[in-house]
Swiss-Prot record:
Family to which the UniProt record says this protein belongs: Belongs to the UPF0316 family.
Alphabetically ordered keywords of this record: Cell membrane, Membrane, Transmembrane, Transmembrane helix
Membrane topology: Multi-pass membrane protein
InterPro entries in the cross-refs: DUF2179, DUF5698, UPF0316
Key word Membrane present: yes
Location (main, coarse): membrane
Name of the protein described by the UniProt record: UPF0316 protein SH1041
Annotated compartments: Cell membrane
Transmembrane stretches, start-end: 8-28, 40-60, 66-86
Pfam families (alphabetical): DUF2179, DUF5698
This protein's GO CC annotations: plasma membrane
Amino acid sequence: MSVITSNPWSMVLAIFVINVFYVTFLTMRTILTLKGYRYMAAAVSFLEVLVYVVGLGMVMSSLDQIQNIFAYAFGFSIGILVGMKIEEKLALGYTVVNVTSSEYEIDLPNELRNLGYGVTHYAAHGRDGSRMVMQILTPRRYERKLMETVRNLDEKAFIIAYEPRAIHGGFWTKGVRTRKVKAYEVEEIESVVEHDDEVQSK
C-alpha cells in the first residue's frame, strides 16, 4: 500500500483500476436486479462491497489532486461500459420478437419452428390488407440471429423485439430448441429451408 501511495502515477492507476472493478460490479448488480435475477444480483453485490471495503476507501481519501479526480471519473465511466458489455455477453433470459409479414408463399411459422424457435402466429389486418403476425420466443443471445433470419426469409417484414418481464405457463421455453437454433448459419438459411421443405414433402 505504501508503494502505491508514495508514487503519484501508481495511485492514479490504482484509482482507475479499483473504480473500474467497483462500478462494473455495481452496474451488473443493478441490471440483474431490474431483470429479476435476485440471487445473481446478491452474489455480484458481495463482490461489489468487497472491492469497496478493500480498495475504495483508499481511493476516496486520495481525491485531493486533479489527476486522481480524472482517474476516478474515467474509471467510473469505463466501469459502466464494462458492466453493460459483460451483461450483454451473458445474454440472460429470453427475447420476444414480433414479426408482421405479408409473405404467405413461404410458410414462415413452420420454417422458423424447424430452425428451433417457438412461434405463435395469427392473422391480422393492416392498412394494405391481410397480414400474418408471429410472436417468436428466442434465447436472448440469439436475438440478432433470429432477426437476420427473418429478414433473409422476408426482407419486408416489420420486426419489433422486446424483453419479457416474466414468462409463466404455456410451452414457449420448451418450444425453443437451443441446439437447433445454434446449429444453423444465417448465410446458409436458404439451403436449410429448402432441405426442410424436401424432407417434409417426402
